[in-house]
Regions:
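Conserved N-terminal structural module of periplasmic/extracytoplasmic solute-binding proteins
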Residues: 2-4, 8-105, 118-121, 316, ...
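Short helix-initiation/N-cap motifs at beta->coil->alpha
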Residues: 75-84, 175-179, 263-278
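Hinge/lid segment of periplasmic solute-binding proteins
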Residues: 101-158, 305-307
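Short, solvent-exposed loop/beta-turn-alpha elements that line the ligand-binding surface or hinge
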Residues: 117-130, 169-173, 204-207, 222-248, ...
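Extracytoplasmic/periplasmic solute-binding protein
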Residues: 137-143, 148, 178-234
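Glycine-centered hinge/linker elements that transmit conformational signals in sensory
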Residues: 182-185, 228-266
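Extracytoplasmic/periplasmic substrate-recognition and gating elements
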Residues: 258, 297-364
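Conserved C-terminal helix/tail region of periplasmic/extracytoplasmic solute-binding proteins
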Residues: 368-369, 375-376, 391-449
Length: 449
């Protein structure tokens, strides 16, 4: 994610330490395979979400200061988590806590996952059914439920509704793709009057941004197909039933944009964030985790709202936001008993302490699935929108990232989408990457099982 950051961020397979944004705490030197001298064990967390790297480092330092337990945090560079995890797990000083994206990612690391059934963090879940399980074994704990959609600038939408001939009088009237397109097209035509550069922020395909499209946007047509066909476990093949709808929304992003398609390959996540925060665009596809960056760029809580991503599917007026988890925490079963216990204690502290609750809910902007967060009112307006949406009675779109056969499937899809956007590829190439390559990547992932 991501979140990510998320809810999954990928491309450029630069492997090794060069690809790691390494963040160690309290100036600790590498400590080999041994535990801390006082026998407390130590913690090494390999974080998946680059957008929360600094926050995890700060939180871990607080824990070290409080308990004396060494905590190291490293964050894999965008798009390199699987390669980085493989490299790090092969070392004597391997991560004691790592992440998988769900059932598919778990298959790669099932030999490394400890049973978390008796841990504090598992017992703090509001609903234990959402834990990642393998038979009776609890192998992963989701620590963030991420919600995403089309973030909109309330001030710009209000300004638009006051223009002569505006297609809506209130943003609540946008409840379908047709209405979204009508409004976006009109805003694009009146961009000079509105003082914007485009209705939508740039659809950047730099690795800091492409996950918004090859994973998050692709999830919408997948979700409709899976719902229609009653799919609940990873399918060997898909049909691409809603690919025309996928094209609808992607074309709209390209046409009513701040940026020419020829420039998208180098456009970053920061570019889109900046365009939106500066009022250069009214719409920005992203999620609850984006608030920290928007706030840092000067936006106020009452300036933002979030719409569902409409694609022209039947009944979408009852569609809510997209929500789910692709962030499951696992503990390395091959770490020493002392390090495993230290890691379990650290995670329990993260979800039960005032410091941890504040870090996850405020500093990282997460919506979390733990009992200890029930009374937390988030300062993140996008989280509040997500909470309201969950109570609205609308059908939320499931996050099917964990069903996607591989990171490579996303990468190939992203490359085909960029080529289509730039005019060097066709939509049929996107179809092949979406449908045909699903089977290829599924077969590759299951070849040794």
């Amino acid at each position: 994610m991501r979140k990510g950051s998320k809810m999954n961020r990928t491309v450029k397979a630069t492997v090794g330490l060069v690809a790691i944004a390494a963040m160690s705490l309290t100036g600790l030197a590498a400590c080999g395979g041994s535990s801390a001298d006082d026998g407390k064990g130590k913690v090494y967390f390999l974080n998946f979400k680059p957008e929360t790297a600094d926050q995890w480092v700060a939180l871990a330092k607080k824990y070290t200061d409080k308990t004396g337990v060494q905590v190291k945090v490293q964050t894999a560079a965008s798009g390199t988590y699987e390669q980085t995890l493989k490299s790090e797990l092969a070392k004597s000083d391997a991560p004691t806590i790592f992440q998988v994206n769900g059932p598919v990612g778990y298959q790669n690391w099932k030999g490394y996952t400890a049973d978390l059934k008796d841990t504090g963090i598992y017992n703090e879940l509001n609903n234990k059914d959402i834990a990642l399980k393998d038979g009776d074994k609890v192998v992963g704990i989701p620590y963030v439920m991420e919600t995403y959609g089309i973030i909109y600038n309330k001030d710009l939408l209000k300004k638009y509704t006051e223009l002569p001939g505006a297609k809506i009088k209130d943003v609540k009237e946008i409840d379908s793709f047709d209405k979204l397109k009508e409004v976006a097209d009109d805003m694009q035509a009146k961009k000079d009057q509105l003082g914007i550069k485009g209705a939508f922020t740039s659809a950047g395909f730099d690795s800091s941004s492409d996950w918004r499209f090859k994973a998050h946007l692709a999830n919408i047509p997948l979700s409709y197909e899976f719902k229609e066909d009653g799919v609940t476990t990873q399918p060997e093949t898909i049909k691409g039933t809603y690919l025309p709808n996928f094209k609808n929304i992607f074309d709209l992003y390209l046409k009513d944009s701040t940026t020419a398609p020829s420039q998208l390959s180098s456009k970053t996540g920061n570019d889109a964030n900046s365009e939106f925060a500066l009022g250069e665009a009214a719409f920005y596809q992203n999620g609850t985790w984006a608030w920290a960056d928007l706030q840092k760029a000067g936006m106020k809580p009452d300036q933002v709202g979030m719409l569902p991503i409409y694609i022209g599917a039947k009944g979408e007026e009852n569609q809510g936001l997209a929500t789910g988890s692709e962030n499951y925490l696992c503990i390395n079963a091959k770490a020493s008993e002392a390090d495993q216990k230290a890691s379990k204690d650290f995670l329990n502290w993260v979800v039960t302490s005032d410091e941890g609750i504040k870090a996850l809910s405020e500093d990282m902007g997460f919506t979390t699935p733990f009992k200890t967060f029930d009374k937390v009112k988030s300062d993140n307006p996008l989280v509040e929108e997500a909470v309201e949406d969950s109570k609205s009675g609308k059908q939320q779109v499931a996050g099917n990232f964990t069903m996607m056969p591989s990171e490579e499937w996303q990468n190939q899809l992203g490359q085909a989408m960029l080529a289509y956007a730039q005019g060097t590829g066709s939509w049929d190439d996107v179809r092949k990457a979406f449908v045909d390559n699903w089977k290829t990547e599924y077969d590759n992932a299951h070849a040794n099982q």
